[in-house]
Curated annotation (Swiss-Prot):
An example Gene Ontology molecular-function term: water channel activity
Subunit organization: Homotetramer. The tetramers can form oligomeric arrays in membranes. The size of the oligomers differs between tissues and is smaller in skeletal muscle than in brain. Interaction between AQP4 oligomeric arrays in close-by cells can contribute to cell-cell adhesion. Part of a complex containing MLC1, TRPV4, HEPACAM and ATP1B1.
Source organism phylogeny: Eukaryota, Metazoa, Chordata, Craniata, Vertebrata
Designated name of the protein: Aquaporin-4
Motif interval(s): NPA 2: 213-215
Native species: Bos taurus
Length: 323
């Protein structure tokens, strides 16, 4: 009998609560600025995949293949991503990588709803970029179109570990380079990210093809229909990215103010459990932190609790995330 009133209350509150939760989750999505950012992620990934995969084409063909030029490939990938971050960083944040986007979600710099659109745009851009390269490349030299594969002498577990490590160093570089609390960063953030990508390729091309980017592997895999060990290029980079983002954000360089608020919240919760149980309603609007947007000489800082922005506020009230 006692469950019926509760069921009635839930019947009235449930749909409303669900609608409110959905509206909060999709806050800022239906804005022109956000869709410009999604389009930028799509275009940046398309150009990146087209240019970088082009460096993997062996123009000697299958009969007389030329030696693989690891330096050429590494520089092309690194400089391509640096250029795209420089071009689109102020529009979308320049993720250009689903693993980076997931790391931003885990560190509360972008909402889950927005990340879904970002990742979809990245994957679509990668497919179209790989498709364009396939169309303009002679069939006799197209080869594997840069599809990432694990070396024959390596197990899937070893390949997974390699992808985890190289993505970890990339994402850690991103978080360290874009840390607004640092005053010693004077060089180009885009170039630092590009160098990190190049280093990952120099190390891991012979191991796994050095993906570090699930969309980069997804695009050519769709065009060529080659899905061998493809899961490695999603699981490895995403785990490495989440570990890097979490360790940097919450262990190595935590925000002092955020840490203080967490302590206050936990202490209040502990005090409430000691007395009578109370249901507390928080009327403050929940605003997620959409991280820093790269601009030359300008750093954007957002207050995590209050959603206050010191510079460059988006018309929707939020700031798009960035690397």
């Amino acid at each position: 009998m006692s469950d019926r009133p509760a069921a009635r209350r839930w019947g009235k509150c449930g749909p409303l609560c669900t609608r409110e939760s959905i509206m909060v989750a999709f806050k800022g999505v239906w804005t022109q600025t956000f869709w410009k950012a999604v389009t930028a992620e799509f275009l940046a990934m398309l150009i990146f995949v087209l240019l970088s995969l082009g460096s993997t084409i062996n123009w000697g063909g299958a009969e007389k293949p030329l030696p693989v030029d690891m330096v050429l490939i590494s520089l092309c990938f690194g400089l391509s991503i640096a250029t795209m971050v420089q071009c689109f960083g102020h529009i979308s944040g320049g993720h250009i990588n689903p693993a980076v986007t997931v790391a931003m979600v885990c560190t509360r710099r972008i909402s889950i709803a927005k990340s879904v659109f970002y990742i979809a745009a990245q994957c679509l851009g990668a497919i179209i970029g790989a498709g364009i390269l396939y169309l303009v490349t002679p069939p006799s030299v197209v080869g594997g179109l840069g599809v990432t594969t694990v070396h024959g002498n390596l197990s899937a577990g070893h390949g997974l570990l390699v992808e985890l490590i190289i993505t970890f160093q990339l994402v850690f570089t991103i978080f360290a380079s874009c840390d607004s609390k640092r005053t010693d960063v004077t060089g180009s953030i885009a170039l630092a990210i590009g160098i990190s990508v190049a280093i990952g390729h120099l190390f891991a091309i012979n191991y796994t093809g050095a993906s570090m980017n699930p969309a980069r592997s997804f695009g050519p895999a769709v065009i060529m229909g080659n899905w061998e060990n493809h899961w490695i290029y999603w699981v490895g980079p995403i785990i490495g990215a989440v570990l890097a983002g979490g360790l940097y954000e919450y262990v190595f360089c935590p925000d002092v103010e955020l840490k203080r608020r967490f302590k206050e919240a936990f202490s209040k919760a502990a005090q409430q459990t000691k007395g009578s149980y109370m249901e507390v309603e928080d009327n403050r609007s929940q605003v997620e932190t959409d991280d820093l947007i790269l601009k030359p000489g300008v750093v954007h800082v957002i207050d995590i609790d209050r959603g206050e922005e010191k510079k460059g506020k988006d018309p929707s009230g939020e700031v798009l995330s960035s690397v």
